[in-house]
A protein has these predicted regions:
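Proteins with a high burden of low-complexity, intrinsically disordered sequence enriched in S/T/G/P/A and R
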Residues: 1-5, 15, 110, 115-120, ...
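Pocket-lining segment of extracytoplasmic ligand-binding domains
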Residues: 9, 41, 46-146
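Short intrinsically disordered coil segments
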Residues: 18-22, 109-113, 154-156
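Short glycine-/acidic-enriched loop or helix-start segments at secondary-structure transitions
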Residues: 34, 84-85, 150
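Segments of small-molecule ligand-sensing domains
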Residues: 130-182
């Protein structure tokens, strides 16, 4: 999941966010605030190095970016909002992550990792092969949720993988083994 900036901004890496207006807080999506902090840490940046723009969620992050109230936005590849922002501002660019910064990021969010992406229809804003910050989505249930219900959910996702990928191409990496981690 990348951080996007205007294509004509001159920014190419997370380090270029220093002094910029960066969406933070994500009061309705608390995990995204931690993800943003971890991504900043890959470039040795903290909240003190940027101008925080508080938002409740990723949609508002994109809206503030399009309205020129923020210099970046955070959103998953494949989301219609990404294409909307791309068209609205005349082009966007995904910022590259420096792998050398991952130890600092893992101090904030231990389960983050890098994914290789390349230009393509599903990867709006990617101009060249690069690494982006990734994290797994988590399905949380209550302790009494039957195991067979979770199995059926994952099996349904495996059986309809082609449909899922058609809607969200990054899910091409999904597998039953990848989808279950205790």
């Amino acid at each position: 999941t990348p951080i996007f900036v205007r294509k004509d901004s001159g920014m190419r890496t997370i380090a270029d966010l220093k002094g910029k207006r960066v969406t933070m807080g994500y009061s309705a999506m608390r995990n995204i605030d931690q993800v943003t902090r971890a991504m900043l840490a890959t470039a040795r940046l903290t909240e003190a190095d940027i101008k925080p723009v508080l938002v409740p969620n990723v949609v508002r992050s994109a809206d503030d970016f399009v309205a020129s109230n923020a210099d970046m936005f955070f959103f998953a590849f494949g989301g219609p909002k990404v294409r909307e922002a791309d068209v609205s501002v005349g082009g966007i660019r995904a910022l590259e992550i420096d792998p050398a910064g991952m130890p600092a990021a893992r101090k904030i969010m231990a389960w983050g990792y890098l994914t290789d992406v390349a230009p393509g229809p599903a990867f709006t804003g990617v101009e060249k092969p690069m690494k982006i910050y990734s994290f797994d989505n988590v399905l949380i249930t209550h302790a009494k949720a039957p195991d067979d219900l979770i199995y059926k959910l994952l099996d349904s996702m495996v059986q309809t993988k082609a449909d899922l990928v058609a809607i969200a191409p990054p899910l091409q990496e999904f597998s039953a083994a990848f989808g279950y981690r205790a």
